[in-house]
């Protein structure tokens, strides 16, 4: 799992 990818998606969603 790419945690960094998930974090980036969350940051982009904010």
From Swiss-Prot:
The keyword Cytoplasm does not apply. One of its GO terms (molecular function) is toxin activity. The keyword Membrane applies. Expressed by the venom gland. One of its GO terms (cellular component) is membrane. One of its GO terms (biological process) is defense response to bacterium. It is found in: Secreted; Target cell membrane. Keywords: Amidation, Antibiotic, Antimicrobial, G-protein coupled receptor impairing toxin, Immunity, Innate immunity, Mast cell degranulation, Membrane, Secreted, Target cell membrane, Target membrane, Toxin. It comes from the Eukaryota. The modification Isoleucine amide is found at residue 14. Belongs to the MCD family. Mastoparan subfamily. Linear cationic alpha-helical peptide that acts as antimicrobial peptide. Has antibacterial activities against both Gram-positive and Gram-negative strains. Has no activity against the yeast C.albicans. Shows moderate mast cell degranulation, as well as leishmanicidal activities (IC(50)=36 uM). Has no hemolytic activity. Its mast cell degranulation activity may be related to the activation of G-protein coupled receptors in mast cells as well as interaction with other proteins located in cell endosomal membranes in the mast cells. This is Eumenine mastoparan-EM2. It comes from Eumenes micado (Potter wasp).
